[in-house]
Amino acid sequence: MIASGLVFFSLVYSRAERKRTERGRNVMRISSEKISTDQAEFQKKIDEKYMRQAIRQAKKAYELDETPIGCVIVREGKVIGRGYNRRNTDKNPLAHAEITAIRKASRKLGDWRLEECTLYVTLEPCQMCAGAIVQSRVARVVA
């Protein structure tokens, strides 16, 4: 149930376009645009590049005898946040890869809104991390 919900969330959310209204509120509009095969292949190569970086982060967790999960957040072709699982090392139940990467990306941007960012993670996010992803307004998730 959670997996199918996250897949649906990812598909819908990745095609969403956020706009600011006159009152300053964000609204989401779902795009029905289809991308060409060339665009899809190009995007696949980009996704593979950043997923390899997320896997490198997961290896750091593995070396610490942690659950090997890694995460990378990208905006405009630049990595702005990285993280790996450190729950046991830090004695912190919130030290998931996604949470760490979101915290670093927000700090780097100086804003909690990660609206134009893509989050790459080596394992489907748990409920806590999925909530954090939604709250931080990440535009796209690749798992």
Predicted regions and their residues:
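Terminal signal-anchor or tail-anchor transmembrane helices
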Residues: 1-11
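Short beta-strand scaffold segments in enzyme catalytic cores
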Residues: 69-74
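Zn2+-dependent cytidine deaminase-like catalytic core
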Residues: 44-45, 52, 81-143
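Bacterial Sec-dependent signal peptides at the C-terminal "C-region" and cleavage site
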Residues: 11-17
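A cytosolic small-molecule/anion-sensing beta-strand core signal
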Residues: 75-76, 103
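Catalytic cores of nucleic-acid editing and processing enzymes
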Residues: 27-50
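Short, basic/aromatic recognition patches
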Residues: 43, 47-63
